[in-house]
């Protein structure tokens, strides 16, 4: 089933809609300390103004969709930090409020700007902007590296996962997000749990499933991307399916495999290609692609069938600006040396 929201949105976006880039890694670049099981959700407590600023930076560099700082924000995770269920729920709602504040501020700046922007380098353009509520995997909550392997052990069943995610999904949907973004889905078990949960709770907010891969054929657990894509295709609540937090070099092949099993829009937002050490909790130096190289893939991704394109970990507002420029003008952007 196609969603009027996503159909109309993509029609207005043109060639493809632009998704914001990395949130947690961009917060770190702004000085936030994310050495915590809550990761970027820690900033909901310590520096919400930084989250708002990063959202705004992405909007001013061409993003059409911003994603809430709730990837690793769970009621269970907040409870482990000493918060009550009610306080945890309030922090989830706050992640949506912050994104909405950034969108409102962006629209205000658009209204205040001159039509030609003069020498203003910001992209101030009145357009539909969607807020996607981020839902991270069960492995992201565990913060033990299993989000990168998809190996939860035999004791974890679909019911376990549904019960874990249920309240968070309800809160994000009730908070007024435009979309639910199920991100870095590592295995078919969790994908099926999400699909069943959306149906059981009759969630009316449209959703996308974005899987993560490290080889161009399978999700990180080893389950085939086609199997996982078929789960998304069979769920009427899911309006787009794709890949995130995966090296850019694998994306083209993954799009082609997904196109075999789904007619839904394809959503693509890879990471920079840098290697993350889940034990040391740090990114490998000089292991990724430059912004120029990242953006050079965009034409091929869109020609292969991608309808929504952005970035994940270690991509920046500059990356997103490059994507915006190549989609809006067809010209390869230039990047300043860093």
UniProtKB/Swiss-Prot annotation:
Catalysed reactions listed for this entry: S-methyl-L-methionine + L-selenocysteine = Se-methyl-L-selenocysteine + L-methionine + H(+)
Source taxon at top rank: Eukaryota
Cofactor: Zn(2+)
Keyword Transferase included in the entry's annotation: yes
Functional pH dependence: Optimum pH is 6.0.
Record-linked InterPro entries: Betaine-hCys_S-MeTrfase_BHMT, HCY_dom, HCY_dom_sf, Hcy_S-methyltransferase
Catalytic activity, EC: 2.1.1.280
Keyword Isomerase in annotation: no
Gene3D superfamilies xref list: Homocysteine-binding-like domain
Main enzyme class: transferase
Tissue specificity field: Present in all tissues tested.
Domain Hcy-binding: 1-327
Keywords in alphabetical order: Metal-binding, Methyltransferase, Transferase, Zinc
Biological process annotations from GO: methionine biosynthetic process; methylation; S-methylmethionine cycle
Binding annotation for Zn(2+): 245, 312-313
Pfam families: S-methyl_trans (PF02574)
Gene Ontology molecular function, alphabetical: S-adenosylmethionine-homocysteine S-methyltransferase activity; selenocysteine methyltransferase activity; zinc ion binding
Assembly with partners or alone: Monomer.
The protein's role, per its UniProt record: Catalyzes the methylation of selenocysteine with S-methylmethionine as donor. Does not methylate cysteine.
This protein's name: Selenocysteine methyltransferase
Organism the protein comes from: Astragalus bisulcatus (Two-grooved milkvetch)
């Amino acid at each position: 089933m196609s969603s009027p929201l996503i159909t109309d949105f993509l029609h207005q976006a043109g060639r493809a809609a632009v998704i914001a880039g990395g949130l947690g890694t961009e917060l770190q670049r702004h000085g936030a300390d994310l050495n915590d099981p809550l990761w970027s959700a820690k900033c909901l407590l310590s520096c919400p103004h930084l989250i708002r600023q990063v959202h705004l930076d992405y909007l001013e560099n061409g993003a059409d969709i911003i994603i809430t700082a709730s990837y690793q924000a769970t009621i269970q995770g907040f409870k482990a930090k000493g918060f009550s269920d009610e306080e945890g729920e309030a922090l989830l709602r706050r992640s949506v409020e912050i994104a909405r504040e950034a969108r409102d501020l962006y629209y205000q700046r658009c209204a205040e700007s001159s039509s030609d922007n003069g020498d203003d380098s910001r992209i101030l353009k009145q357009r539909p902007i969607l807020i996607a509520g981020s839902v991270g995997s069960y492995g992201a909550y565990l913060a033990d590296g299993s989000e990168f392997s998809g190996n939860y052990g035999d004791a974890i069943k679909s019911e376990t996962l549904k019960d874990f995610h249920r309240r968070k999904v309800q809160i994000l949907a009730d908070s007024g997000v435009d979309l639910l973004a199920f991100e870095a889905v590592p295995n078919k078990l969790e994908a099926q749990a999400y699909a069943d949960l959306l149906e059981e709770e009759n969630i009316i907010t449209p959703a996308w499933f974005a899987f993560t891969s490290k080889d161009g054929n399978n999700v990180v657990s080893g389950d085939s991307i086609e199997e996982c894509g078929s789960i998304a295709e069979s769920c009427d609540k899911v309006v787009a399916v794709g890949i995130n937090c995966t090296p850019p070099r694998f994306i083209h092949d993954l799009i082609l495999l997904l196109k075999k099993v789904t007619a839904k829009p394809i959503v693509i937002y890879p990471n920079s290609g840098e290697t993350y050490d889940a034990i040391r909790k740090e990114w490998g130096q000089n292991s990724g692609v430059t912004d120029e190289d990242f953006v050079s893939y965009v034409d091929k991704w869109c020609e292969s069938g991608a309808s929504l394109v952005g970035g994940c970990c270690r991509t920046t507002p500059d990356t997103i600006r490059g994507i915006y420029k190549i989609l809006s003008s067809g010209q390869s952007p230039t990047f300043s040396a860093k």
